[in-house]
């Protein structure tokens, strides 16, 4: 079994990994590069975009740096992805009037899929993207495990995953996003929730949370904090469409204490399907936590004319690097001008050093290939007894 990393070893994001035998070729993830513009050219990989030269594509999760090029994969190449992942990306695309790619099938925990002479087994893992998977590839008597993106600090028990994973594998392709941050230790979502509770109690005014509408764990965290401080939870229509697509125990518009609102009147027809739909009059008289996006500045200004933002709070719950974005800077500055106190509450969607070492110690690879990292050399220090393969392949 051969491994070729077309992209993603000495950088964060943009993963495209080829696994092949003499008769079968598959790809694990087809990601956009994080630092490129939206008009980036397709990678020059024969048979992936121009014709059907591969037997399948497997997508670990729905973040753009792992899935973004799936829309351009040749239509005759089957794509596999988690079912809830697909529901989320479909809801997002539908809201934006984008046509979603059609998968051949769905990934499920420990349900193997055989393509040619390669068998792929997904393992459900925790990440800031809901329904993420590690992928075990087996062929020619060898086992290769691709971690995708993972963490130990979410709401899924990490020990459960470690018990489920295969042992004594031939090669581990392991992400190391956080290895550039020396001494970094991930805060848990539960710890984040408790911090949010204290903030929501201390700041008696309205609370706005700036976070990704696709970060389901963070939605759960903020919903639980709202519930514990007797605040209603407000989801703008885009988030509501995503959470309702998953349903179940995820806070969604069908919960009695979750309310949905719109910032664009043209969206009212879509909003009307939900029972708990509200407007500014209701919101202005309520004690709430509202999830917002940085495109909602004019809406917040309009809302501030109907209610006081005194003792109000804006919780910034993204990676800190996004604060350098011009649009984000403007949004945060204007929120301060509206009288909101800005507080950062965020934790990484990626494993810290301790979690990475635990994983490596559990699966016991013969060799380790770093991916999704800007500090691949750190793996040699973390696990000196494991062969670490680093190639300049970008």
Regions found by a protein language model. Name each.
Residues 31, 177-182, 238-249, 346-355:
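Short connector loops at secondary-structure junctions
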Residues 76-79, 98-107, 120, 253-261, ...:
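Active-site regions of enzymes building and remodeling cell-envelope glycoconjugates
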């Amino acid at each position: 079994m051969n491994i070729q990393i077309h992209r993603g070893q000495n950088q964060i994001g943009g993963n495209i990994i080829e696994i092949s035998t003499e008769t079968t070729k598959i790809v694990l993830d087809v990601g956009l590069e994080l630092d490129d513009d939206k008009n980036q050219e397709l990678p020059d990989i024969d048979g992936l975009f121009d014709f059907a030269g591969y037997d399948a594509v497997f997508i670990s999760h729905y973040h753009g740096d792992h899935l973004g090029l799936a829309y351009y994969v040749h239509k005759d190449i089957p794509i596999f992805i988690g079912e809830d992942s697909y529901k989320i990306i479909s809801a997002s695309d539908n809201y934006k009037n984008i046509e979603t790619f059609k998968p051949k099938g769905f990934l499920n925990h420990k349900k193997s899929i055989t393509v040619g002479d390669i068998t792929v087994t997904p393992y459900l893992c925790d990440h800031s993207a809901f329904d993420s998977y590690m992928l075990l590839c087996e062929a020619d008597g060898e086992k290769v495990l691709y971690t995708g993106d993972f963490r130990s600090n979410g709401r899924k028990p990490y020990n459960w995953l470690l018990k489920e994973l295969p042992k004594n594998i031939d090669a581990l392709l392991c992400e190391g996003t956080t290895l550039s941050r020396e001494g970094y230790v991930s805060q848990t979502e539960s710890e984040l929730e408790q911090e949010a509770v204290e903030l929501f109690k201390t700041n008696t005014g309205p609370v706005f949370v700036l976070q990704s509408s696709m970060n389901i764990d963070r939605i759960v965290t903020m919903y639980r904090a709202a519930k514990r401080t007797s605040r209603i939870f407000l989801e703008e229509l885009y988030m509501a469409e995503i959470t309702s697509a998953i349903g179940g125990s995820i806070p969604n518009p069908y919960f009695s204490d979750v309310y949905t609102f719109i910032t664009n009147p043209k969206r009212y027809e879509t909003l009307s399907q939900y029972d708990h739909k509200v407007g500014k009059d209701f919101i202005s008289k309520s004690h709430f936590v509202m999830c917002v996006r940085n495109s909602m500045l004019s809406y917040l200004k309009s809302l501030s004319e109907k209610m006081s933002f005194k003792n109000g709070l804006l919780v910034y719950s993204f990676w800190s690097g996004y604060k350098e974005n011009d649009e984000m800077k403007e949004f945060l500055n204007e929120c301060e001008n509206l009288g909101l106190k800005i507080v950062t509450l965020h934790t990484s969607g990626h494993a810290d050093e301790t979690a990475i070492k635990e994983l490596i110690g559990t699966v016991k690879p013969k060799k380790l290939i770093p991916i999704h990292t800007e500090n691949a050399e750190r793996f040699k220090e973390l696990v000196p007894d494991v062969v670490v393969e680093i190639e300049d392949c970008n």
